[in-house]
Amino acid sequence: MSKPNVLTQILDAVTETNTKVDSVQTQLNGLEESFQLLDGLPAQLTDLNTKISEIQSILTGDIVPDLPDSLKPKLKTQAFELDSDARRGKRSSK
């Protein structure tokens, strides 16, 4: 049996190294895609923290929140209906 030529050994080592580099590059590309999904996470966490702090303040009575505009007209309408019913001497069924 003859020994493998030095150039053949070098070629085999380079081929094996190239295969390993390709595998690592594929893994890195996958990680890069995963990190891109996390780009907006700090802003989302900050927003969530702010909302949680506001909720905690409301629950402890530190602040009283303003009602959303979508609820204000309904409350005015309901108050008007209750007032009208009271003037007519009717009991509210609400």
Curated annotation (Swiss-Prot):
Where mainly located? host cell
User: What are the entry keywords?
Assistant: Host cytoplasm, Host nucleus, Late protein, Viral occlusion body
| Protein location | Host cytoplasm; Host nucleus
One Pfam family name is NPV_P10
Q: Which InterPro entries match?
A: NPV_P10
Q: Highest taxon of the source? A: Viruses
Cellular component (GO) terms are: host cell cytoplasm; host cell nucleus; viral occlusion body
Q: What this chain does, per the record?
A: Plays a role in the proper virion occlusion of the polyhedra. Forms extensive fibrillar structures in both host nucleus and cytoplasm. Involved in the liberation of polyhedra from infected insect cells.
Q: What is this protein called?
A: Protein p10
Q: Which organism is it from?
A: Autographa californica nuclear polyhedrosis virus (AcMNPV)
